[in-house]
From Swiss-Prot:
Keywords: Adaptive immunity, Cell membrane, Disulfide bond, Glycoprotein, Immunity, Immunoglobulin domain, Membrane, Phosphoprotein, Repeat, Transmembrane, Transmembrane helix. The chain crosses the membrane at residues 169-190. Glycans are attached at residues 1, 14, 28, 59, 142. This is B-lymphocyte antigen CD19. The lineage of its organism: Eukaryota, Metazoa, Chordata, Craniata, Vertebrata. It comes from Cavia porcellus. GO terms for biological process: antigen receptor-mediated signaling pathway; B cell mediated immunity; B cell proliferation involved in immune response; B cell receptor signaling pathway; B-1 B cell differentiation; immunoglobulin mediated immune response; positive regulation of phosphatidylinositol 3-kinase/protein kinase B signal transduction; positive regulation of release of sequestered calcium ion into cytosol.
Length: 430
């Protein structure tokens, strides 16, 4: 115990540098030599002699030789014997300096479980545990410092993130996820812009505004807008007209009676069933042109088809009246579609059962009840049958099928004259 050491100088009466006296019963204290890199002692301490017998209870002596810059662990006592209770103090004795007390501690029943360092007035605790919690007092002269310390247990995950560098794993994962999401958003935006650009380019391209239709053999010649229409035949003109109107999304209002439309459709179906199927496929490929250049391919040449149209119209003529004048054949005026008198009756026509397997689908003997011949007008590139009006004499056979016709208000009233001569049927647009 160095605190019990008294005068360590070896005088002539206490001893010499050669060693202890032979009569001494106590071991001598050791000398501490500090060596530098040149393997020479930095200083030569004087020999330390044992204190008087009465001043020591027990003396343990050790000889230590260390190199310059080494770390020393000086143990007070021989392991594993530890002081469990009582005061502990360390005092440094230098031959050329006065004695200095390094550390004074009073140990309790439970020794501290962590390392403690004293650096001047500072107490250093390394690897603090829960047992280190409590109140610490520091006495320095007349000043007393009281410190209350509370130790909180840190979660294992948080400890792993901070002490083991585990925070790098979630940080890198988060950065990678943000990068992937950003790349995906940029890719979708670029793809959307490219799709819109292709659509805009396709819509503005004049070569792609119309369908490329391959013409059937013998039905027309190809062009950039589709097929050039051939002249209508007697059996397919009406069906083709109706299909053109359906393909263009328009609705052609029929100004003739129902018998004429039904008989024409029946006659077309019975005479040329294969032609109607071909024309139906052909009609679906047409599209209405936006310019006048495209519409000229759909024009009807009235001069070339005049003979054929005359044949079609021959079955619709009324034998009682003569042919219309040249003024009536030129064109249709708007007056033909207006109702001059809402009270006048609409002409009545008699239908024929065209679905019956017996008999003809067209009865020429009853043509007196139908309206006049058809004339063909060209409107927006579409050919349709424009009926001409003929006088109609009501008879007793008209009342038999009165429920099958429209606008049977007053069939017996007189009809106004057409163009100053003959009779004119009044049409209702209702």
């Amino acid at each position: 115990n160095s605190s019990d050491l008294g005068d360590f100088s070896c005088g002539p009466g206490n001893g010499s540098s050669e060693g202890p006296t032979p009569s001494s019963q106590h071991p001598n204290s050791s000398q501490l030599y500090v060596w530098d890199k040149r393997d020479s002692p930095s200083w030569e301490p004087e020999p330390v002699c044992a204190p008087p017998r009465g001043s020591l209870n027990e003396n343990l002596t050790q000889d230590l030789t260390v190199a310059l810059g080494s770390t020393l662990w000086l143990s007070c006592g021989v392991p594993p014997a530890h002081v469990t209770r009582g005061p502990v103090s360390w005092t440094q004795v230098h031959p050329k300096k006065p004695d200095s007390t390094l550390l004074s501690l009073y140990l309790r029943e439970k020794p501290p479980v962590q390392e403690m360092w004293v650096l001047g007035p500072v107490l250093s605790l390394s690897q603090v545990t829960v047992q280190a919690a409590g109140t610490y007092y520091c006495l320095r002269g007349n000043l007393t410092t009281e410190i209350h310390m509370k130790v909180t247990a840190r979660q294992a995950v948080w400890h792993w993130l901070l002490r083991s560098g585990g925070w790098k794993v979630p940080a890198v994962s988060l950065v990678y996820l943000i990068f992937c999401l950003g790349s995906l958003v940029v890719f979708l935006q670029i793809r959307k812009a490219l799709v819109l650009r292709r659509k805009r380019k396709r819509m503005t391209d004049p070569n792609r505004r119309f369908f490329k239709v391959t013409p059937p053999s013998g039905n027309g010649t190809p062009n950039q807008y589709g097929n050039v229409l051939s002249l209508p035949t007697p059996g397919s003109s009406t069906g083709r007209t109706q299909r053109w109107a359906a393909a263009l999304g328009g609705t052609i209002q029929s100004y003739g009676n129902s018998r004429s439309d039904v008989q024409e459709t029946g006659a077309m179906g019975s005479r040329s069933p294969t032609t109607a199927g071909i024309e139906e496929e052909e009609g679906e490929g047409y599209e209405e042109p936006d310019s006048e250049e495209g519409s000229e391919f759909y024009e009807n040449d009235s001069n070339r088809g005049q003979d054929q149209l005359s044949q079609d119209a021959s079955g619709y003529e009324n034998p009682e009246d003569g042919p219309l004048g040249s003024a009536d054949e030129d064109s249709f005026s708007n007056e033909s579609y207006e109702n001059a008198d809402e009270e006048l009756a609409q002409p009545v026509a008699r239908t024929t059962d065209f679905l019956s397997p017996h008999g003809s689908a067209w009865d020429p003997s009853r043509e007196a009840t139908s309206l006049g011949s058809q004339s063909y007008e060209d409107m927006r590139g579409i050919l349709y049958a424009a009926p001409q009006l003929r006088s109609l004499q009501p008879g007793p056979h008209h009342e038999e099928d009165a429920d099958s016709y429209e606008n049977m208000d007053n069939p017996d009233e007189p009809e106004p004259a057409w163009g100053g001569g003959g009779h004119m049927g009044i049409w209702s647009t209702r």
